[in-house]
A protein has these predicted regions:
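Conserved N-terminal alpha-helix of the aminotransferase class I/II PLP-enzyme fold
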Residues: 64-110, 117, 132, 139-140
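PLP-dependent aminotransferase-like
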Residues: 108-179
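Conserved PLP-binding catalytic core of the aspartate aminotransferase-like
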Residues: 321-352
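Active-site phosphate-binding strand-loop segment of PLP-dependent enzymes
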Residues: 41, 141, 154-213
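A glycine-/small-polar-enriched, mobile loop at the entrance of the PLP active site in fold-type I
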Residues: 34-85
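Conserved active-site segment immediately N-terminal to the catalytic lysine
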Residues: 206, 220-231
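PLP-dependent enzyme catalytic core of the Aspartate aminotransferase-like
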Residues: 5, 28, 35, 354, ...
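Active-site C-terminal subdomain of aminotransferase-like
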Residues: 230-311, 326, 395-397
Length: 397
């Protein structure tokens, strides 16, 4: 090989040294030790879903194939896709005049796809900035379009992201293409508890619902478009759900490339290109799990209890733990808190890991702690976290 490389004038490149494996955590866990994953995403999945996927990994339903290796155009996968959509429709009570797509590119791709598809013939899009992800969306939306991305409200300027811009304060033009907002902000722990009501003469709502979809009841008919990355409350990363009102498809211009064009994806039954087959399959298993739990209605009850219990532990800590968010705007999905001391916060993150409470560090720009308590997080996980919080306070308070 060296002679061949020398003849071609190419040089050999030494491989970097292989580093010895170091376990991330310094405690050995047994199968009986409960592990609770508080990651903001990719996030916890129901154990029964993982075990079903495990049992079907090599042979899905007697086909002799794994879903990972199955043709996306096979009858078997088309059935998986069909049932995933139907189960999602049932869970969210999606009206017949809405289309459902399983796309790729994450929710971030929708920042531009919504503008490219829905602003044809319009001069303005209204954008509400309420936290980190809506801020990024606002920055991204205008990059591939000449339409004016108008800042309708800014929660950072109004409240330093400790409260949400009231809907009454949104500066909305009735002639705008749509109003974009993020209903739950994972970084700042903010959530609109009530869906904004804009009126029939106002632009349609386009909502990033990534971190709360299926966690509570919503009226899909209140929205023009709902989109959600799967990796928080649905399934593994790799697929993005888009729910779009049918009449809005008339805005999709043929000048938008097919891969970014909602109408092109719908006209091809979601098969314009190869969809994320395995994430769709896992998402379908999660939808069935949600149905077995009593649907979104039951999950809303459990999620409300989990959040209420955890916030009570923070508020009743005598100031040792702090949450700066206005109570009415507190997220039920992403609970942020801190001790007010960076060294103590880091110690909390380290020690909680040894107790099986994983990935509690706050977002990199925020610090502190963040407990993401999505649908698949059991109440027992929240109770285990609270128990550790009290023990930690006794030692260092």
């Amino acid at each position: 090989m060296a002679e061949i490389l020398a003849a071609t004038g190419l040089q050999t490149i030494e491989s970097p040294p292989v580093k010895a494996f170091r376990p991330i955590f310094n405690r050995v866990f047994t199968v009986d030790t409960p592990i609770y994953n508080f990651s903001a995403g990719p996030a916890v999945l129901p154990e029964s879903v993982l075990r079903t996927a495990q049992s079907e990994m090599f042979d899905y339903n007697g086909t002799g194939f794994s879903v990972m290796t199955m043709s996306h155009r096979s009858d078997v996968f088309m059935s998986i896709l069909y049932h995933a959509e139907q189960d999602l429709r049932q869970l969210l009570h999606i009206p017949d005049n809405y289309k459902v797509l399983f796309l790729q590119g994450g929710a971030s791709a929708q920042f531009n796809m919504t503008v490219m598809n829905l602003s044809n013939g319009f001069k303005r899009v209204d954008s509400v900035v309420s936290g980190n992800w809506s801020r990024i969306a606002h920055q991204e939306m205008g990059k591939l379009s000449d339409v004016d991305i108008h800042l309708a409200a800014h929660g950072g300027e109004m409240f330093d992201y400790t409260d949400l811009p009231p809907v009454a304060s949104w500066d909305i033009d009735p002639s705008s293409a749509f109003v974009h907002f993020v209903i739950n902000e994972t970084v700042h722990g903010l959530q609109y508890r009530e869906v904004p009501k804009l009126g029939a003469d106002m632009p349609p709502l386009v909502c990033d619902m990534s971190s709360e979809i299926l966690s509570r009841r919503v009226n899909v008919a209140d929205f023009g478009v709902i989109y959600a990355g799967a990796q928080k409350n649905i399934g593994p990363s790799g697929t993005t759900i888009v729910i779009i009102r049918e009449d809005l498809l008339d805005r999709c211009s043929s000048r938008v490339p097919d891969v970014w064009n909602y109408r092109s994806h719908i006209n091809r039954q979601g098969m314009y290109n190869t969809p994320a087959t395995y994430p769709i399959y896992i998402s379908g298993l999660v939808f069935r799990w949600l149905q077995s739990q009593g649907g979104v209605e039951h999950m809303e009850t459990i999620n409300t209890l989990k959040a209420k219990t955890l916030y009570a532990a923070i508020d009743n800590s005598g100031g040792f733990y702090r949450n700066r968010v206005a109570p009415a705007a507190r997220s039920r999905m992403n609970v942020i808190f801190s001790t007010g001391n960076q060294e103590l916060d880091e110690l909390f993150a380290q020690e909680s890991t040894t107790r099986g409470l994983r990935l509690l560090r706050g977002y990199k720009s925020m610090g502190g702690m963040r407990a993401s308590i999505y649908n698949a997080m059991p109440l027992q996980g929240v109770e285990a976290l609270i128990e550790f919080m009290r023990e930690f306070q006794k030692r260092y308070g």
